Every structure is written in C-alpha cells, then in structure tokens.
UniProtKB/Swiss-Prot annotation:
Name the UniProt record assigns to this protein: V-type proton ATPase 21 kDa proteolipid subunit c''
Residue ranges, Lumenal side: 1-9, 73-93, 166-183
Family in the record: Belongs to the V-ATPase proteolipid subunit family.
Record lineage: Eukaryota, Metazoa, Ecdysozoa, Nematoda, Chromadorea
Phenotype caused by lack of the gene: RNAi-mediated knockdown causes embryonic lethality. Causes defects in alae formation in the few surviving larvae and impairs yolk uptake by the oocytes from the pseudoceolomic cavities. Causes an increase in the section of the excretory canal, which often has multiple lumens and abnormal whorls.
Membrane topology of the entry: Multi-pass membrane protein
Stated role: Proton-conducting pore forming subunit of the V0 complex of vacuolar(H+)-ATPase (V-ATPase), a multisubunit enzyme composed of a peripheral complex (V1) that hydrolyzes ATP and a membrane integral complex (V0) that translocates protons. V-ATPase is responsible for acidifying and maintaining the pH of intracellular compartments and in some cell types, is targeted to the plasma membrane, where it is responsible for acidifying the extracellular environment. The V-ATPase is required for the function of the excretory canal. Involved in receptor-mediated endocytosis.
Highest rank taxon of the organism: Eukaryota
Pfam families in the record: ATP-synt_C
Length: 214
C-alpha cells in the first residue's frame, strides 16, 4: 500500500510539473514572448558543476532509495514468513544482500563522477575560439555527468524494486515449498543485473567528461 501510494504521488507530481512547464512555454510562445522562455540560455548560463552535482546526487539518492525500498519489501516478507517457517530467515538474507548491492553501485558511481570534477572558472576564459571550445567542453562534461547520474540512479531504483519484489516472493515461496527457492533465486540474479547495466552505461556516458580551464 505504501509503495503504491508513493508511486502514485511521484507520478502525479511529475505530470503536474511537466504540464506547468509546457503551459508556461506555450503561453510565452503564443503571446509573442517566446524569447523570455529560453531553455538554451538557461543551459549555457548555469554552471557545469551544478549539473555534475545534480547527477552525483541523483546517482546516490535514487540508488539508496531503491535499495531501501527493496529491503523494506523483502524484509517484511521474510519476517512474516519466518513466523511459520523459521528456516527461511537465514538463506533468504541473500535477497537483502542483493538489495544492499544496489546502494553500493550508486556509491561507487558517485565516487567515479566526483573524481572527474576539477576547477573551472568561466570568467578566466579568453574571448577567443579556444575559450569557446573550452566552455563547450566543460558544459558538455556537466551534462554528461548529469545524464550518467540519472541513468545510474534510475536503473538502480528500478533494480531495487525488482529485487525487493522478487525476493519477497522468494521468501513466501520458500516458506511453502523449499524446492522453489533456487529457481526464484535465478530470477533475482537477473533482476539484480539491471543495476550493473546502469553502472556500465553510466561509465560509458561519462567516459569523455573533462573539466578545467585548459
């Protein structure tokens, strides 16, 4: 119930925010003031470190959210099933470990992204083509880390949910029939691979990210 309510609330807020942005853009465009809704100006005027910081934050926070949600889902089933079948408590801790690995993926990638940061001062750039090229490279690096952080965070969020739900089913099935545990564990391993895929894509996305005034 709680998980469903959180998902519905998140979806509602996302839809409302999207409609507000679209409505504002359409209003300015249809009223002849489209220049006031300049997304390009916003993207090029903001600091690339801001985008990189947001990417790092999303990578860590969404991964921890997915891990916590998965542990909550699995843990409640293990505790409930363990009342009638105490033998399931120990071996079903594997599901908890899989969920915890999701958070570890996010932490590792956050450190990888932080390692790519370096000092960059826009005002020190020369007003030449080389200066514009350096600015473009730093802006692109910020966007890369932002996109990589979103990729890792969302992948780990979905991975944590999948592992938690499958782990919950594994605990209940194991309590009823011990022969089912290994079969469901295979499904859980494939579910946990989603987070690994997100890590790999995040590394590929940020492979060429480079900050600095040179």
């Amino acid at each position: 119930m709680a998980a469903g309510a959180i998902l519905k609330t998140t979806a509602t807020l996302t839809v409302i925010t999207t409609l507000i942005i679209l409505g504002t853009g359409l209003f300015y465009m249809l009223s002849g003031q489209g220049h006031r809704f300049d997304i390009g100006w916003f993207l090029t005027s903001t600091s690339p470190h801001m985008w990189a910081g947001l990417g790092i934050g999303f990578s860590l926070s969404l991964s921890v959210l997915g891990a916590g949600w998965g542990i909550f889902t699995t843990g409640s089933s293990i505790l409930g099933g363990g009342v009638k079948a105490p033998r399931i408590r120990t071996k079903n801790l594997v599901s908890i470990i899989f969920c915890e690995a999701v958070a570890i993926f996010g932490i590792i990638m956050a450190f990888v992204f932080v390692g790519k940061l370096a000092e960059f001062r826009r005002e020190d750039l020369p007003d030449t083509e080389d200066g514009m090229a350096i600015l473009a490279r730093n802006l692109a690096s910020g966007y890369m880390i932002f996109g990589g952080g979103l990729t890792v965070g969302l992948s780990n969020l979905v991975c944590g949910l999948a592992v938690g739900i499958v782990g919950s089913g594994a605990a209940i099935a194991d309590a009823a029939n011990p022969a089912l545990f290994v079969k469901i564990l295979i499904i859980e391993i494939f579910a946990s691979a989603i987070g690994l895929f997100g890590m790999i894509i995040g590394i590929v996305q940020t492979n060429k990210a480079s900050f600095g005034n040179k």
